[in-house]
Amino acid sequence: MEKQRRSKGEAGGRGALPTYNSAVFKTVRTILLFAIFLIAGYAMATGGCADFSSKLPNVRAPLCEAAGLLDMQARSVKGRTIWGRDVAAADAGLRVLVIGGIHGDELSSASMVFHWIALAKQPMADMPMPVHWRFVPALNPDGLFSTPARRTNANGVDLNRNFPTPNWSRDARVYWESRTRKDPRRWPGPRPLSEPESRFLHGQMDSFKPNLIVSVHAPYGVLDFDGPAVPPSRLGRLYLDQVGIFPGSLGNYGGIHKRVPVVTIELPNAGRTPQDAEMRQMWLDLVRWTQDRLGSGPVEQQ
């Protein structure tokens, strides 16, 4: 009897497991799940703007939220959303794909795309060939939101060397080893289109079928061009300086192989955007060139 009494006393003492009211537990769980749902819903509704506005130069929350970014139904290596926005005239005859943030540490490239979305939404009087613009501000969100931001994606791949140019398997690794001395920032990856981010952009080229691709980079302060059509001589203060092609690059694949003109903008500073007026002038120059050189009809594609 004594042992039984002691056992019962111990069972109710310090070593006993606490008991929970199941109704309270269910209520707390429901509240937590609802809170998580609200947070996720807010992030989706604002297009990830809390993250963008805290990371990018010259991108405040109102600018980002006004962009109205949508989930492009694509994810990075780490599962981050790739956001985009279409600005399209009802009778658009041209399709232009604008990409920023291919390299995550080129923050200004993503910032300028946000400013261009705002400009694209403003009506323009002199546009005989209306345009369907598709903007992707940050193709490489894992690189962008790393601390510090880094050029490559989460797998350490330079996305601008991962496109399936002819003889990629032969040329890309040779170039990386001999010309860059195995620079890890420029590793082309184990195979072409090995990365979800480059596969997404490749898919956009196939499905959206752009007449022009604009790829925004930094920090070399020049304007590059690959493909058919007469290139723009300048955009704002950036002058044409064709620097050549690289195995696996978007310019090589899109402009040379697929025959889709690729304008590559190299902003002069990766951490700071040009002045707003300068970004506007670059936009106006791009629109005028698009109308002058591409407005007569689509460029032949392969």
Model regions: which residues?
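Intrinsic disorder/low-complexity segments enriched in small, polar and charged residues
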Residues: 6-10
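Short glycine- and acidic-rich boundary segments immediately preceding or forming the N-terminal edge
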Residues: 37-83
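Conserved beta-strand scaffold positions in the cores of enzyme catalytic domains, especially
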Residues: 69-70, 84, 98, 135, ...
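Short beta-strand-to-loop junctions in surface cap/lid or active-site-entrance loops
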Residues: 84-92
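Active-site/substrate-binding loop(s) of hydrolase catalytic cores
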Residues: 93, 97, 107-242
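Active-site-adjacent mobile loop/cap segments within catalytic or ligand-binding domains
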Residues: 222-226, 234-236, 248-302
